[in-house]
């Protein structure tokens, strides 16, 4: 929507920013405050619009020159017959003089050739002229005249530009490409939503404040509705809750479709993952959960699409209060007002004044939060040594396994009273946690160059995790938050004491239609190159950013050599796979290759690829492999809903996936036994760590950074399972040494053969 439209809307007296009260709701703004807030929002909006009109400089390094089509034919020798053969040495001098002329460079710049493109075009043109046996008659005659002193060197320019446009076809259509990649008004992409006046209701509050409860209550009351959540687990929860309440509801995720009606007739209510929601189906009520993820660098585009595009009379968004101002600002561009409901936490949580410091101090209802699998393995093992049972939850586990572990932890009759988890517990699972214990406050990540970085968790992340302590519907009405290490506690208090950074922009992503239009103009470009050029040419409003497309490009480059049509290639590249898993990537490549042969990917074919049937895991590496196989089966199911004819056996795949999930659950239930089974043979590794948790986070942090940098340099020479686990990053040297020491002690106590721990040889 244009700024003029905003001015018109603001001039209408009924436009206002309303803050309504609800059960446990907070403040109500006065009229003067509302007008001031509206005026401030409009000032910011006008500034963003005025600053977004100019396009960014074109990154010409993305333009890859195409090979020149030679047009030698019977007419090729006409030029030589009319004049005389060209002297190559003289011709080279003429071409070099042409290249050095500032006037030609300026003229080429006006035609879209910057210094980089001008140089590349000239090198190609010079090679073409010097190596062709016979040139076109007109070019041959012009060059001959210049060599003889009868022509001007500038006469070469039209032929040079003709050649430049052959190797850089985008020069002829750059204006069209800019129009296609203009992302400044994404609201206009959804005409169905713009055709109605929608009511936007923002339910703002922290974790466990009841904000989603009130939105879902309205969803269940409506004649039709759609729930859009960030996780399959959340979509499943709403699907089950809705049907249990007597409201027929279908489930739609990337890998699954469940229709309540036995004949497959769609229900009035749908629970879906955010990427799968329909922006053309009309609804009475739509719920968008975790709206703060609109700023997510990779998935933010899905929340933007849902917020701008859902065709519903009421849009209920749930999320952090830090997103209220931005969502209000964004909705001004569509002429829709925002009604804000502020919620307070139903059960309080407090920050402890003491760190746990030792696993001996654990109590029932404790959840230790780690940010790496290695820490989960280590702590799980140490908890078992103390005679306690623990549940384990981390991101790469299948949803069924996560639910089983959550159920085990929540069951008051189960002896398992401790949970060890990653930040995967931040959303999607209902857990009866009394105390959240941060094992660390730093998280490892990869930057754009693929290098490991260590960052302290943000206030938003810390609050999301800490908010899981104490729950209104659980036995623990009050929650507590602390750290494992004493040095971390003041840092945690500082993090939780800071205000959450307000959201500034929303994510966008190029659509398949936009990429197809690009490909029409640039038929020889690869998909990865098309995406790069699109992002380079794209223009966005100050309210938006283009999401990270590195994963998309990674998959595009992986299957570039496989012959696929553009639409199929695009769909394959949007598949949600973990590129860090080699087995998953290899399977993805096999899927694409089989698809390109127009051969259906049958159940038997898939079983051969994954070596089905698979046994329960005997060690950690087996467990990791089973998780990867589960991801491959998920990939098959995801593709089966996009290419039904080519992936025909989804029901059979789903059956073996359930069996695989059970095997993974067996492995997770016995995770400490799998750790003990890592290697029964001693290795030349120095035993220098104890079974107690180190007190100093500073030394721990330094040690982890050094391990990540030097891990490959210090691998044991022995080609054992332990060395392979170390090489794959599934196990640290310190953890291996510690485990070997513990196994030796246990075997000595049982009067078994002792394990001799050797010392690492000094270099």
Curated annotation (Swiss-Prot):
Entries under Gene3D superfamilies matching the protein: 1.10.1740.140, 1.20.272.40, 1.20.58.1080, P-loop containing nucleotide triphosphate hydrolases
Reaction equations catalysed: ATP + H2O = ADP + phosphate + H(+)
Chain intervals for the UniProt region annotation (Disordered): 39-58, 679-721, 742-763
GO process terms (BP): DNA recombination; liver development; mitochondrial mRNA catabolic process; mitochondrial mRNA surveillance; mitochondrial ncRNA surveillance; mitochondrial RNA 3'-end processing; mitochondrial RNA surveillance; mitochondrion organization
Compartments it resides in: Nucleus; Mitochondrion matrix; Mitochondrion matrix, Mitochondrion nucleoid
Domain Helicase C-terminal stretches: 354-519
Function, in words: Major helicase player in mitochondrial RNA metabolism. Component of the mitochondrial degradosome (mtEXO) complex, that degrades 3' overhang double-stranded RNA with a 3'-to-5' directionality in an ATP-dependent manner. ATPase and ATP-dependent multisubstrate helicase, able to unwind double-stranded (ds) DNA and RNA, and RNA/DNA heteroduplexes in the 5'-to-3' direction. Plays a role in the RNA surveillance system in mitochondria; regulates the stability of mature mRNAs, the removal of aberrantly formed mRNAs and the rapid degradation of non coding processing intermediates.
Protein name from the UniProt record: ATP-dependent RNA helicase SUPV3L1, mitochondrial
């Amino acid at each position: 929507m244009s700024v003029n439209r905003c001015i018109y809307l603001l001039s209408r007296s009924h436009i206002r920013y309303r803050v309504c009260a609800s059960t446990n709701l907070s403040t109500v703004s006065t009229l003067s405050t509302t007008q001031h807030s509206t005026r401030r929002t409009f000032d910011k909006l006008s500034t963003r619009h005025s600053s977004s009109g100019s396009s960014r400089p074109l990154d010409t390094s993305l333009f890859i020159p195409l090979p020149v089509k030679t047009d030698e034919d019977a007419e090729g020798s006409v030029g030589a017959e009319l004049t005389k053969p060209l002297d190559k040495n003289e011709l080279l001098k003429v071409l070099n003089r042409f290249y050095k002329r500032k006037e030609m460079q300026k003229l080429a710049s006006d035609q879209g050739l910057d210094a980089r493109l001008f140089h590349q075009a000239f090198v190609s043109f010079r090679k073409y002229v010097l190596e062709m046996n016979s040139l076109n008659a007109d070019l041959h005659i012009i060059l001959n005249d210049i060599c003889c002193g009868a022509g001007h060197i500038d006469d070469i320019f039209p032929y040079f530009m003709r050649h430049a446009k052959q190797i850089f076809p985008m020069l002829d259509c750059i204006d069209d490409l800019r129009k296609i990649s203009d992302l400044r008004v994404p609201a206009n992409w959804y005409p169905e939503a713009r055709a109605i006046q929608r009511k936007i209701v923002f339910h703002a509050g922290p974790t466990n404040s009841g904000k989603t409860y009130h939105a879902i209550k309205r969803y269940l009351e409506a004649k039709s509705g759609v729930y859009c959540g960030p996780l399959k687990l959340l979509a499943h929860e709403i699907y089950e809750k809705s049907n249990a309440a007597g409201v027929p509801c279908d489930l739609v995720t990337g890998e699954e479709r469940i229709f309540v009606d036995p004949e497959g007739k769609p229900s009035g209510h749908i629970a879906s993952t955010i990427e799968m929601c329909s922006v053309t189906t009309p609804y009475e009520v739509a719920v968008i959960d975790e709206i703060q993820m609109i700023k997510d660098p990779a998935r933010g585009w899905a929340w933007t699409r849902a917020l701008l595009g859902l065709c519903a009379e009421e849009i209920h968004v749930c999320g952090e209060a830090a997103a209220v101002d931005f969502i209000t600002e964004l909705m001004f561009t569509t002429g829709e007002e925002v009604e804000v409901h502020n919620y307070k936490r139903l059960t309080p949580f407090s920050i402890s004044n003491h760190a746990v410091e030792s696993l001996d101090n654990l109590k029932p209802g404790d959840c230790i939060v780690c940010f790496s699998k290695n820490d989960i393995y280590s702590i799980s093992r140490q908890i078992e040594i103390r005679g306690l049972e623990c549940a384990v939850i981390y991101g790469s586990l299948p949803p069924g396994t996560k639910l089983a572990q959550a159920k085990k932890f929540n069951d008051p009759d189960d002896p398992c009273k401790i949970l060890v988890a990653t930040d995967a517990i931040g959303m999607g699972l209902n857990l009866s946690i009394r105390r959240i214990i941060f094992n660390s406050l730093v998280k490892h990540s990869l930057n754009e160059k693929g290098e490991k970085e260590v960052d302290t968790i943000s206030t938003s992340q810390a609050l999301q995790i800490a908010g899981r302590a104490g729950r209104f519907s659980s036995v623990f009405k009050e929650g507590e938050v602390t750290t494992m290490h004493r040095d971390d506690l003041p840092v945690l208090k500082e993090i939780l004491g800071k205000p959450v950074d307000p959201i500034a922009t929303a994510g966008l992503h190029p659509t398949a239609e936009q990429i197809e239009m690009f490909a029409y103009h640039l038929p020889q470009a690869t998909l990865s190159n098309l995406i790069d050029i699109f992002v380079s040419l794209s223009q966005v409003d100050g309210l938006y950013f283009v999401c990270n497309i590195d994963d998309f490009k990674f998959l595009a480059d992986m299957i570039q050599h496989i012959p696929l049509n553009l639409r199929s290639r695009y769909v394959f590249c949007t598949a949600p796979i973990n590129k860090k898993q080699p087995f998953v990537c290899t399977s993805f490549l096999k899927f694409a290759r089989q698809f390109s042969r127009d051969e259906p990917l049958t159940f038997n074919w898939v079983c051969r690829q994954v070596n089905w049937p698979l046994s329960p895991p005997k060690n950690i590496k087996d467990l990791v492999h089973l998780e990867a196989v589960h991801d491959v089966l998920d990939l098959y199911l995801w593709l089966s809903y996009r290419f039904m004819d080519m992936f025909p056996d989804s029901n059979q795949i789903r059956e073996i996936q359930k069996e695989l999930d059970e095997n993974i659950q067996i492995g997770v239930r016995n995770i400490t036994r799998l750790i003990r089974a890592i290697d029964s043979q001693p290795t030349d590794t120095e035993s220098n760590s104890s079974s107690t948790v180190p007190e100093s986070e500073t030394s721990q942090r330094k040690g982890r950074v050094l391990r990540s940098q030097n891990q490959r340099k210090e691998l044991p020479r022995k080609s054992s399972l332990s060395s392979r686990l170390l090489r794959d990053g599934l196990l640290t040297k310190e953890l291996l040494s510690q485990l070997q020491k513990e196994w030796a002690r246990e075997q000595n106590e049982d009067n078994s053969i002792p394990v001799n721990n050797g010392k690492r040889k000094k270099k």
